[in-house]
UniProtKB/Swiss-Prot annotation:
Main location group: membrane
Ranges of the Cytoplasmic topological domain: 825-844
Glycosylation positions in this chain: 59, 95, 112, 159, 207, 262, 310, 374, 384, 416, 493, 516, 550, 696, 712, 744
Protein source organism: Arabidopsis thaliana
LRR repeats: from-to residues: 102-126, 136-160, 161-183, 185-208, 209-231, 242-265, 266-290, 292-313, 315-339, 345-362, 363-385, 386-409, 410-434, 436-457, 458-481, 482-504, 506-527, 528-551, 553-574, 575-601, 602-625, 665-689, 690-713, 714-737, 739-762
Keywords recorded for this protein, A-Z: Cell membrane, Glycoprotein, Leucine-rich repeat, Membrane, Receptor, Repeat, Signal, Transmembrane, Transmembrane helix
Protein name: Receptor-like protein 49
InterPro entries: Leu-rich_rpt, Leu-rich_rpt_typical-subtyp, LRR_dom_sf, LRR_N_plant-typ, LRR_R13L4/SHOC2-like
Membrane topology: Single-pass type I membrane protein
Subcellular location: Cell membrane
Gene: RLP49
Length: 844
């Protein structure tokens, strides 16, 4: 088709207009998605305050495309910021440019641990931060989980009236939850777990009618005070009002009381966790009538009875944990749980069970805990549990051999049969190797004896076989367990040396305590992953393996009662997580401090070097860097194997041996340097260790005075300074230590009266004997008899007489002195000074 010139021009114009229109639309659309300049500037300022680890945060690009940034497509305002777990570096301050983003609706800053990290100077008070966040009035979602925030929650947080999700868990706040939290009318999720809150929880939380998930776990809520949520009536009244709740977690507080019988009114409840409290009475049957309930955790309380009632076959309950309560001795038939057809996890430990031969549990059950259930026969119904993954039948009265069919269960991977009376295994020597993917086996505290069982080579991670009767050398077949990370063979009769093939293992935990093992501990047997080494009460000789210095995660070293001959292992200070050192009863020698040593053990909790041959003087600042003993707040490292096994150590407190297991290490802090040859003054810096519970410096050669500053050790329960060469008096300030139950100052050179304070006077007289100069109760020696008292009275009378004569003499000399003074004054002022001075000069 042919077009005229005019038509061609018209077509060109039309196409040009169309192109311009399209381009203008594109430009408008492009411009529409650019965030506003003030929003970009605020974000860029925030980036400059921290190191935001993203290459997309560039100043010449659309900030709405930056990682973690969401914008309103209509206004260009930033409405969402998600930088959770971004390793933001630096304290978030209350004047941060972040708070200029006034249109924010979602803010995720969780797991950035530097926000309130060090102190009130270079960190951030959580209260200040939340006060600033309280001005972001459009916020709907706020997550500051695990940011190391501290301080008090401000009431301004209640200004966030649009908030639906609030997560402040895993921080270090103080005080109580503010009443204003009840103003968050649209709140659906409230997570305040592990925040160190205490006391009253506001009843205003009962106003949160939309609340679906409530987590107040791992705090310190009690029933103290008339308005406290710890008062169970208040607690349940508030909870029962919130009929939208699906998740309730009140675990690990100090709540007390009884659960109400009408718990079924929480008809939407799916998850109910109250473990680790002090609830008592009966577990009401109404809990099992909630049709939506999926998980129920009531462990570690004081419940005494269980009311199951009629359980609907429509029950959705999958997890039921009842262990660790104080159930009465009435026998409960295991078959009452049979109607729970969806049950996959059942813990009934501590309940006196009847298990009939015909009992059957739901086939989907995967985790079964029957510990301490007074079972005397291996449960035969387990043979049909083809989905069983983990079995715990520890602490019962089962005798005989472990049945062969147990190892044929196809899904079984974790078995705990400890604390029974098993004496062997049915079937061939390799019967356990037929157990598929078995990764955890605990056969401790039985009466097993040789031969040691053959184990699955590829899957075994955790092996516990302590407190049995195994003997001979440690079997080299253990070295074939390539994936083994925990090996506990304590309290057997193993002898010989540690197999050198242990170098093939990558152990985190190696415990061989109380055997008859001997020889030099091989350097190559130390895995650089080692966190806990316990070889106490054996016959090892030689030196400590220096390869321990490569174990950067080492926390626990226990070598008590061996024949190890070495100098003090000061190189252990290089291990950043080191906490427990027990060298007691060996042949260590020499000084425990040398010039140039810093001996900075910031995390050390237990220091026991007693009964060795250490010598030398400790400088006054020796204990200054030991910060874990001077502060309550101290990070506790969590391990992937936590729950499988706990370290233990035997210590002396108040004259008695006591065993610390597991969490006892977090609160128990002790120093024992007794039975050595240390000398010089007791270091003043020891008074900085305010969390110290036991201090034993007895049977050394310490001299000088007892530091009065020991009265700063406000948590001290036991003090032993006996059998030294200490002189001077017993400081009366020690009587201010209200927890000090035992003290011993005997066999020193102390003198003077024993302080007459309650804490000191309650001690036995043997705590003060063999100090010739000490007197007063509880010793029979009085501080001065009758003759001495008479002499003292005579001295006082003589002193009084001398004072009287002095005053008389002063009075006699007073009058002529005044006359003489007046005469001399008259001479001086009457211009006869030269004559007077000439006369004076004749006598000088």
């Amino acid at each position: 088709m042919m077009y005229s010139c005019r038509e061609r021009r018209m077509i060109t114009v039309k196409w040009s207009l169309c192109l311009i229109f399209c381009l203008s639309n594109s430009i408008l659309v492009f411009a529409k998605h650019l965030c506003l300049p003030d929003q970009r500037d605020s974000l860029w300022g925030f980036k400059n305050e921290f190191h935001v680890p993203s290459e997309k945060w560039r100043n010449n690009t659309d900030c709405c495309s930056w990682d973690g940034v969401s914008c309103d497509p209509k206004t260009g305002n930033v409405v969402g910021l998600d930088l959770a777990g971004s390793d933001l570096n630096g304290p978030l301050r209350s004047n941060s440019s972040l708070f200029r983003l006034q249109h924010l609706q979602k803010l995720y800053l969780g797991c950035n641990t530097s926000f309130g990290s060090l102190s009130y100077n270079d960190g951030l008070k959580g209260g200040e931060l939340l006060d600033s966040i309280g001005n972001l009035k459009y916020l709907k979602v706020l997550s500051l989980r695990g940011c190391n925030l501290f301080g008090k929650i401000p009431s301004s947080l209640g200004n966030l009236s649009y908030l639906t999700h609030l997560d402040l868990s895993f921080n270090d706040f103080t005080g109580v939850i503010p009443d204003s939290m009840g103003n968050l009318n649209y709140l659906r999720v409230l997570n305040l777990g592990k925040c160190n809150f205490y006391g009253k929880v506001p009843s205003s939380l009962g106003n949160l009618s939309y609340l679906a998930q409530l987590d107040l776990s791992y705090n310190d809520f009690t029933r103290e005070g008339p308005d406290s949520m710890g008062n169970l009536n208040r607690l349940t009244d508030m909870l029962l009002k919130l009929n939208s709740l699906t998740d309730i977690d009140l675990g690990s507080n100090q709540l007390k009381g009884m659960l109400p019988s009408n718990m079924s009114s929480l008809s939407k409840l799916e998850y109910f966790y109250i473990g680790g409290n002090s609830f008592s009475g009966s577990i009401p049957s109404s809990l099992f009538m909630i049709p939506s309930l999926v998980e129920l955790d009531l462990q570690r309380n004081h419940f005494s009875a269980l009311e199951i009632g009629n359980i609907s076959s429509q029950s959705k309950l999958q997890v039921l944990i009842l262990g660790g309560n104080n159930f009465n001795p009435d026998i409960v038939d295991l078959s009452i749980f049979s109607p729970l057809l969806s049950l996959g996890y059942l813990d009934v430990s501590g309940i006196n069970l009847k298990i009939s031969s015909t009992v059957s549990l739901p086939s989907p059950i995967e985790y079964l805990v029957l510990s301490s259930c007074n079972i005397s026969e291996f449960p035969k119904f387990l043979r049909n549990q083809t989905k069983l993954y983990s079995l715990d039948i520890s602490a019962n009265q089962i005798e005989g051999q472990v049945p062969e069919w147990l190892w044929s269960l196809p899904e079984l991977q974790s078995i705990n049969i400890s604390h029974n009376s098993f004496n062997g295994f049915e079937g061939p020597a390799d019967v356990i190797q037929g157990g598929g993917e078995l990764y955890m086996l605990d056969i401790s505290s039985n009466i097993f004896q040789d031969p040691f069982p053959l184990l699955p080579v590829d899957s075994m991670n955790f092996l516990f076989s302590s407190n049995n009767r195994f003997s001979g050398e440690i079997p080299k077949t253990i070295c074939e367990l390539d994936n083994l990370v925990m090996l506990v063979l304590s309290n057997n009769n193993f002898s010989g040396s540690i197999p050198r093939c242990f170098e093939n293992l990558h152990l985190y935990v190696l415990h061989l305590r109380n055997n008859n093992l001997s020889g030099i501990f091989p350097e190559e047997a130390i895995s650089d992953r080692l966190q806990s080494l316990d070889v106490g009460h054996n016959l090892f000789s030689g030196e400590l393996p220096k390869s321990l210095i490569n174990c950067s995660a080492l926390e626990f070293l226990y070598v008590e009662d061996n024949r190890i001959s070495d100098t003090f292992p000061s190189w252990l200070e290089l291990l950043p997580n080191f906490q427990i050192l027990v060298l007691r009863s060996n042949e260590f020698y020499g000084p425990i401090f040398s010039p140039g040593d810093s001996l900075s053990f910031p995390r050390l909790r237990i220091f026991d070097i007693s009964e060795n041959r250490f010598t030398g003087v400790l400088p006054s600042d020796y204990f200054a860097p030991w910060s874990a003993m001077s502060s309550v707040v101290d990070r506790i490292i969590q391990h992937f194997f936590q729950g499988y096994y706990h370290n233990s150590v035997v210590l002396t407190n108040k004259g008695l041996n006591m065993e610390l297991v597991g969490s006892g290490f977090t609160i128990y802090k002790t120093i024992d340097v007794s039975g050595n040859r240390l000398e010089g003054d007791i270091p003043e810096s020891i008074s900085l260790l305010k969390e110290l519970i036991v201090l034993n410096m007895s049977n050394n050669a310490f001299t000088g005075h007892i530091p009065p500053s020991l009265s700063n050790l406000s948590n001290l329960q036991s003090l032993d300074l006996s059998q030294n060469r200490l002189s001077g008096s017993i400081p009366g300030e020690l009587g201010e230590l209200t927890f000090l139950a035992r003290m011993n100052f005997s066999y020193n050179r102390l003198e003077g009266p024993i302080p007459q304070t309650t804490q000191i006077q309650t001690q036995d007289s043997s705590s003060f004997t063999e100090n010739p100069g000490l007197c007063g109760l509880p010793l029979k020696k009085n501080c001065g008899g009758k003759e001495e008292a008479t002499k003292q009275e005579q001295d006082e009378e003589k002193e009084e007489e001398e004072q009287v004569f002095s005053w008389i003499a002063a009075a006699i000399g007073y009058v002529p002195g005044v006359v003489c003074g007046l005469t001399i004054g008259h001479i001086l002022v009457s211009h006869k000074r030269d004559w007077f001075m000439r006369i004076v000069s004749l006598f000088t």
